[in-house]
């Protein structure tokens, strides 16, 4: 008899889990496919814009941004229930994802909603540097992004631009005042990182910038 009770309880639990998973699966799929109509329907039924994909740990907004689902992303960002600073398992926020995917519209919308531009560790500016988007990097700097923000391994946005071969962003950051003399946890400068990644031309640009700086004199 006790076995039958346990089986019945397990069956009820599985049915409950399946029922909960249905709408979650649907909203994740809507985010992936940019199904604006389905998203509106699900949100109208009370499903949260902060729903997390149980498979990836990403929010549906992050999924929409990653997949280029502009309509769904815009609707989620406009939802006043949206929690702007939700993080994926790797620490990414929606603003970071938007910067990496070069989604200028989403970056502007998220900042207008109050998204944090500079966080401890990895920042949206690192991601804009990695993707090579000078427009988004400029927007972030205009909204007071810390230009020398350091990742957990002490990589600055300039170092990321150098490593990824993004010369335009590297030059933008240098013009904006990035400190080219900083070193990461391997004791490498941005120039050395560029050379190691076989981007000697970017390394040369950084070296020329350093050479033109005023010499620091001890008091």
Predicted segments with their positions:
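Sec-dependent signal peptide recognition
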Residues: 2-10
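Ankyrin-repeat inter-repeat connecting loop/turn
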Residues: 49, 83-84, 114-117, 147, ...
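Start-of-repeat signature of ankyrin repeats
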Residues: 23, 56-57, 91, 121, ...
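Intrinsically disordered, low-complexity regulatory segments in ankyrin-centric signaling systems
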Residues: 20-47, 55-58, 74, 78, ...
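Ankyrin-repeat-protein effector appendages
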Residues: 20-29, 143, 176, 185-188, ...
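Ankyrin repeat A-helix N-terminal signature
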Residues: 29-34, 62-69, 97-103, 127-133, ...
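Ankyrin repeat structural motif
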Residues: 35-43, 69-78, 103-112, 133-142, ...
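Ankyrin-repeat boundary/linker signal
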Residues: 52-53, 87, 117-120, 150, ...
